[in-house]
Amino acid sequence: IIVEDPDSVEPLNTILHENGKYIIGRMGIPYHKRKICIISIALDAPQNTISALAGMIGNLKGISVKTAYSSVISKD
């Protein structure tokens, strides 16, 4: 997740909080020189849930998101 608009941080955090049961870990990196934040999030969720979450996040102003999927399939 790349955050270019600081005003979108609060709605982003709300979305992440609402989906916290899927979040394994989160790392935020402030890049002061470029005035952006880079956020990496590891999720354990069905692919459709991840896609929906990425869509919600990507619709926020000044935020872009990319997803990567593992080939590991859960038996849970």
What do these predicted regions represent?
Residues I1-D76:
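Long, contiguous binding/interaction regions
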